[in-house]
Amino acid sequence: MLNERDFDLIFDSYDFKHEGKVHLSNFLPIINDLQLLHPASAPPLLSEFQKQCTLEFVRQNADLSITKDNFRDVYKKLTENEDDSFANQAEKPSMEQQNSKNSIKEDANEHSVNSAHSKSSSNASPESLNPSQMMSKRLSLPPMSQFTDSDFVNILRTPFAQSTPLNRNTSSRNTEMPLVRKDKPDFSNGHHDLIKQITELQDMLDKARDQARKKSRTVDILEGKVNELTHQLNMADSKYNESKVANNSQNNQIKTLKAQNLNIHKNFQKIQSELIQTNSGLYSTKKELSALQVRYATLLRKFTDQTKKIEELSLAASRSSENENTIRRLALENHELKNSNNQLNNHIDDLTREKHLIALSNNPKGDEFLSPSNLDEMVYSKEVGLSFTQPSVCISIPAVGMRESEELRELEFKCKQQKKTIEECKHISQSLQSSLTAESSRNKELVAGFLMLSEEIGIQKWIIQSLSKMSPTLNDFCRRYDSSMPTYEESSHECTVLSSFSDDETGLMATNTTMNNSSKDFMASQDTVNADNPHFLATKGQPLLLLSVMKSNILRLFYVLFLFACFYGLDYILCAELLQAFLRVVFTFCEHIIILLYGRYELVQPS
């Protein structure tokens, strides 16, 4: 053996199960593999006799296993080496060859001196014995002469030679000589030089046979290794092809995943840009909504003030209705007094005629004194009484005329005052009616504006919900939007509050049926705005209403275009965004123009 590393490698090659031990039948193949690693000039690790002894021992103990340490111990016992390593075996001199040469020389000398047959190697002295003979004596084994060539036929091969059948080189085996030489023939003393030549040739022949045997064995081992390596190479090639196919499939999957990742990243950037735009739009709508809320609060305050004024006017109207009743009662009394006055005048005329006739009958000469002019002065004078014969008549008539005239004056004064109050009440009712119509038109404008605002908020909410369905990352944004923005129910509640206020107005107007005959038209529904206030819709409300409707329709159209553009790339989305921004600018410009044309505070602008 060269070193411990080679021994460990060869031993592990026979340890198929990696148990740290091999079968005892693998002892000689391991020795042969180690021998192949030695140079050709190095002595063999085991002699033929030692190999034969080992083979017999293996046959007797075929079921045993041996470890590395046991392997070293057995080898030490066979070679009588006390060192722990096998590396020093190569440095020992080839004692076996020298002893064999010495024994041959000694045998030749003995034959030459005694002219008899040479002694057997078994009868030689201990000094002249070779290591194999000494080993046989020590182990009490039969000598090598008893073994023939047939005993060495079943020599174990290497595991490579056993595992794969190889084309063996039989040319050297056909000329193979027996491993153990037979007993040397006796030579005469005259053939000493010939014996030397024969021994040298025999040694050369043995070396050549050993080298040929080693070469054939190395060829067998190498062929087995080549076959095993070709088998492993084929397996590795198949595995390489499989791994190549798997790698190609994995590369294709990686490419598809990269493409999907790029698409997802692009979609994420698109959605992020859309979110930023929607966030900016929502921020602007929030600002507009806050401004509308402030304006709504101010309008609500004004509306409450107007309702208070309307209540006061309704109280005044109720009082004026009471005054009208008193006026009617006083007018009836005046009419009755006029009738009574006429009756009294007729009665006075009758009395004057009777007295005139009486005076004519009593004083026929007093025509001048009793002329009609004098009689009239006497009758209609309120300070001087008539000189009648009957004093009761002369006293009672002037008194009745004075009372009636005073009452008539008082009644005329009261009638004038009542007429003035009636005219004032009519004027107040007309102003109240005009203010109520103006407030009702403004309330209708507010209701229409808030309805359009709620509709646009609902559209924006629907767009955001649909976008959130497309991307799950928008759910938190939708929740924040729902919590921050007023819902459609709140806006509808505001509209119902406004409609309730308008209903209260109509109820207040309906109480004064005598002063406002057009309250039935104001009690109509909000769908008949054109019939209630056609001037407003013709001049102010109709452009703003058409603009808001157009705006909501274009928002729906842009949402459909956005969904269509999501499937055809980024260029369509950029064009749609630019067009949408341009139209927003145009709509805001139109709104500002409408505000400047029709007044800033007369129109309610939807967001």
UniProtKB/Swiss-Prot annotation:
Residues 111-132 have a biased composition (Low complexity). Its main location: cytoplasm. One of its GO terms (biological process) is cell division. It is found in: Cytoplasm, Cytoskeleton, Microtubule organizing center, Spindle pole body. GO terms for cellular component: cytoplasm; interphase microtubule organizing center; meiotic nuclear membrane microtubule tethering complex; mitotic spindle pole body; nuclear membrane; Sad1-Kms1 LINC complex. Keywords: Cell cycle, Cell division, Cytoplasm, Cytoskeleton, Meiosis. InterPro entries: EF-hand-dom_pair (IPR011992). The keyword Transferase does not apply. Has a role in karyogamy, recombination and segregation during meiosis. Although it has been shown to associate with the spindle pole body it is unlikely to be involved in its formation or maintenance. Interacts with mcp1 and sad1. This is Karyogamy meiotic segregation protein 1.
